[in-house]
Amino acid sequence: MNGNVVMKAKDTVFAALAECFVTIGTRRYNFMQAINLEAKFEKNKTEVPILGKTGKGNKASGWKGTGSATFHYNTSIFRQMMLQYNETVEDIYFEIQISNEDPTSGAGRQTMILMDCNIDGGVLAKFDADGEYLDEDMDFTFEDFKMPEAFKDLEGFLTN
């Protein structure tokens, strides 16, 4: 494989070098409590029968956005959302902005903004007499997203 271009180890993005902001209404929070977050885009597909073929085709027919996060149990902003829903039946939608940037990587910076996020539920109260620290998990959905900053193509990635 002489001449094969390979990725440089330094171009990986260090996992902890990220920023996360949550915007609820007019308030923007530096969500430094986050331990991890993952947002997924899943296309809905419809099977399409095609005359003259033994197999079926697949046509995209929409999408859904889902996510999950784990964060330190030291903020009440999501419990306040649940309390407001319980008291008023008004559901709260919010934005999450995630940026990944490792200054030692040639990939640069990527920023994703998840819009119209909505929590599925959450922890109201918690303790662990045998634990070291408290954290909590949260699942959520989102209805739109944008990417104002994209990673750069690494050297050798684009071949034509």
Model-identified regions with their sequence ranges:
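Intrinsically disordered, low-complexity terminal/linker regions enriched in Pro/Ser/Gly
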Residues: 1-5, 149-160
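Solvent-exposed edge beta-strands and adjacent loop segments
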Residues: 2-79, 116-139, 146-147
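Short, acidic/charged, Gly/Pro-enriched secondary-structure junctions
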Residues: 82-113
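Short intrinsically disordered coil segments
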Residues: 83-88, 133-135, 153-160
